[in-house]
Amino acid sequence: DEVLKTEITIKDSHNALTEKTNNAVVKFDHVDFKYADGEENVLEDIDFEAKPGQTVAIIGSTGSGKSTLAKLIPRFFDVTNGKITLDGVDIRDISIETLRSQIGYVPQTGILFSGDINSNISYGAPGIDEAGIKEAAQIAQATEFIEDKPDKFESAIAQGGTNVSGGQKQRLSIARAIARNPKIYIFDDSFSALDFKTDTQLRKALKPKTKDATVFIVAQRVSTILHADQILVLDEGKLVGKGTHKELVKTCETYMQIAKSQLSEAEFAASIEGKED
């Protein structure tokens, strides 16, 4: 009942653009954000640019605003001050359908629908063929467990994915985003339910597929983002560091503390020398 009474606050502007972008350059231009019922900014003066072919990672302690930042890109919320642009156009001037059709968003907890594996992967990718579905599953490291099921890709999925494990649910959600072949990928802490080996294999397989896309990864594990082209370090909603792993361990105390708390001395040394996997 409450949902029905809630007014939709994110709406299309009067002359919203419906043409898709050629080049997914995402720019945060001095963005502040606070929730409608909040008194203080959750994000403050966030300023950066992400280009196609780049992986931009977002890291920080719990409550630092990582997921909130990611949710601003598909306009789940609107910025309070500043603006976010896609190819130089304020995303508030682009129709919501057009904007979101170019984004593959994977939340922290995978979302599945009642149906079968095929329909869950192809949801949001009209016209995708069997080969496309299988490729998406392969990249998402889901093929092995799918092939182990008696009905393979036609295996039933319960509403909410209650009949698959957390890691399997996550891999199917990632496969769905890949199947869309979007210009922008947002992985909102989507790899946390995966073991280290699967995480590594998935990111390796993902790289050639996303080479022309703009990729955002919200992460808790430093190991997930060592090779990111740009790492944004958030602390209490502020951007306290921006650069590569090797740059940030020298210039950003917050990042150095996170890295040293998660990596062994040997791993930390190898990561700076570029000898890690």
Where are these predicted regions, by residue range?
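ABC-type nucleotide-binding domain
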Residues: 5-13, 17-277
